[in-house]
Swiss-Prot record:
Membrane-protein topology: Multi-pass membrane protein
Gene name for this UniProt entry: AGC1
Pfam family, one: Mito_carr
Protein localization: Mitochondrion inner membrane
UniProt record, GO biological process: aspartate transmembrane transport; L-glutamate transmembrane transport; malate-aspartate shuttle
Keyword entries, A-Z: Amino-acid transport, Calcium, Membrane, Mitochondrion, Mitochondrion inner membrane, Repeat, Transmembrane, Transmembrane helix, Transport
Spans traversing the lipid bilayer: 524-544, 584-604, 621-641, 663-683, 723-743, 778-798
Protein's name in the database: Mitochondrial aspartate-glutamate transporter AGC1
PROSITE patterns: SOLCAR (PS50920)
Primary role: Calcium-dependent mitochondrial aspartate and glutamate carrier. Transport of glutamate in mitochondria is required for mitochondrial transamination reactions and ornithine synthesis. Plays also a role in malate-aspartate NADH shuttle, which is critical for growth on acetate and fatty acids.
Solcar repeats: 521-607, 615-702, 717-805
Family designation: Belongs to the mitochondrial carrier (TC 2.A.29) family.
Domain of life: Eukaryota
GO molecular function terms attached to this record: L-aspartate transmembrane transporter activity; L-glutamate transmembrane transporter activity
Amino acid sequence: MELSSASTVKKKRQLAIFNAYATPLRQDERRLRASYEHGGVVGGHVASNEKVLLFDDFVDLISNSRSFYSKFTDHCFNLNQIPNTVFGCIFFAIDENNKGYLNVNDWFYFNNVLEYDNYHFIILYEFFRKFDAARERAYGPSVKSINYGNRFLSFDELYLDLEQFQATLRLLHSCVRDDFIVNNKLFLDWKQFRWLKWYQFYPRGLLQNGPHITLNSLISIVQNDLKSEKLLLGFHCLSQLDHRTNSMTISKNQLVYLMRLFYSHKIPADIFNSLNMSTLSCAKCDNNHINYNVFRDLFYLIQNFDLLNQIVHRYAEVHKFSDRDVREQHISRKDLLRFMNTEYNKINNIIEFSPAQISLLFSIVTNSKKLNYLNNARQNNPELSYHHRDSEIDSFIHNEYINGNAASSLHNESLEKFNDDFENIIQADAGDTKQQISSTDWRSVFSWSSFLSSFEWLHFKKRKSVQTNGLSDEYVNEALTLEDIMKIVNPNYLNDLVHHMELRRIESESRSSNLYFYPIFDSIYNFTLGSVAGCIGAMVVYPIDMVKTRMQAQRDFSKYKNSIDCLLKILSKEGVRGLYSGLGPQLIGVAPEKAIKLTVNDHMRATLAGRDGKLSLPCEIISGATAGACQVVFTNPLEIVKIRLQVKSDYVADAARNSVNAISVIKNLGLIGLYRGAGACLLRDIPFSAIYFPTYAHIKSNVFNFDPKDSDKRNKLNTWQLLVSGGLAGMPAAFLTTPFDVIKTRLQIDPKKGESVYNGIWDAARTILKEEGIKSFFKGGPARVLRSSPQFGFTLAAYEIFHNLFPAPRYDDSTTHRPTREPVGALAPINKTVSAFFPDQLEPHVGNNKWASRLYGPNIDPYSSSFLNYYYKSCQVAKAFMDLDYNFAHFDFNTYQQFHDELNAMKNKKH
């Protein structure tokens, strides 16, 4: 754990956030105010001119931390509701010495606690421990601090005074100002829990120490006993006698109120408006009379939403659903029950769901979908009708955000509107619970209709003509999809959608970014691998290249009748060594040639790719042509030296043959001479690459079904498949560009005595056609095909194999600082490449699972060691408090003030 004085990238970011929200204390204010004016601090402590976080400052910081980063959001779009006031509990817990504000040391302590796995339980414990510590200080002994980083520390060693714990909860209840809760006495009385005695213990076995409970016991109580106690209390306080059946029942409005009270922080808000008990054929109840059995079934479902979410995901996986299937394939209650009860590979071995409970689940999902349809078809003209704000979110997801330009102002405005709409929905749905419970028309409450995409409504219209005044429950029930269920059982559904889009956008931007060191290193890395791969390919086929050059250099067929005859004569006269004459310049030249060609082609393909990552055929041709043009600058000088050395036995006398080497050729030609035939070289290499690379890509895609961006296709090919792809692509490219290769070779060698001298490309073409015929333009063509095809096959196969064997190193922002472009708020945006953020994303998928969906349930956390997800973790802490007592949802400043005063009174109490 880092100290507050540690100077790291993370600490600097933490300090920047603190300074952005902290309130500077005035220099003339030597003592803090004793009042609570506008979130002020409590008196008694000497103040300096340091910056501090007041209550409202801290709550604003946590609430606004969702937008700290411009590239991704921190759970902005979760469908459950976490009141911002609960963050005041964290403020109270981490305020050392009950100062009434947080200084920078408190802030760093909070950041350190968030690093622990069980940070939410630690903060919950610290909240109640403050009162125990205050009592102990009043008696005299000092209170020891706890090192939560100690791996030997057990939650059984952390305990609380049970009587003080209960007194703290009673203090919370005394602060509640909700008339409905107060009038109906919806307070958990811990003194009435008969099972509590089984959790308590006495430190050191001494009765005078009083009963205590450990943190482990408290967690067990929250996870088990309190759930039942809340339901019993709620039903007992609100139920009334139904004279028809002589049984106790509650109304739908009362049920919804209890659901909001107990689970609004954990389940999607859409559920509250999707209850309609009159549609339950298997339960003898209606919206005015809901019996205890249905009441418990509903909360049983809610408590097991996580398992249900995993079941529907497993259903999609077993049936090999694609993302589209998840949205469109229908599922019935019988289908789901049959799947859950399958004997082999059973999912729910411990938790069981009855048919009545599954019917209740489908009723909720059906009502939600029906309300969505009615809201979208409210008027006769859907295009001009009013849509709820949440339908705008759906339009944004499926249109603007996916296809928008991240760098454009229009995109930024759309994203801001998206955020505003979402906030309005949350605020509208949260409402005043008192007013909602007394309202007779619950349909007037704003409905979460957001998450059915427009094509689903079109799908409804195509399947069945339905009037706008209603939908058949049976019809909607039959038309439910897995996605419909996911929207109900998973409060992170929308956030997961947005998160995947953000990951794809970060990945897309990282490919084209040229402002950071990593892309530069990436090019050097590709250049090196391309060089080595090119040398391997050149050495394998160099003898064929020798035959090709000799055949193209001769102006008649007096010496070599064909390629085979040429090969045999070279072997007989010059030996095997003669086949590799000029190999040195070839290896020197092939390294930059192949490396430049491969690197430029990769760069151009990434630059010209569309938003969906695909490349049109003209763009593929442009990419290949650009790569071929760039290589000529480096390779033409070395190629002319190679050719001179390859034909020296035919054009140089025996006495002078040994004196001809690469250095002598360079001295003889000079700088300008080294670029002789460069124009013909361009005419050869540009069309060659323009033909080769698109052909290579299409053979891999169409013949071998290769597409790493498509989960339904292969993301890796075998070596032989790479060789075949490269070899087949090289054949048409090599043969069709042979005439330009012949012209280039003729221009780059000196003619023998009596042979015509060429004055440029067109003169050479006319002379060859006139003196030798059109057939001479394809001299060495078979040898060129045999050389180029396997050479590029070996080169590209080696290039891709090296990429797999020697992956590029990944950089972390903690070791390599990169400049930022557009700081947002207190933090700069993310500038890392996707490989640095998400190394797991680069690992190949195991197996051939068709439903390797990137739309549901992302398992990637975009927070590295340098980025901080305050909002998500603070929400987890808030859930822990609300699970313990739902009244923590109203821990506003007035409540905090009473807790602060009570704690100070305990400290100052004299015994």
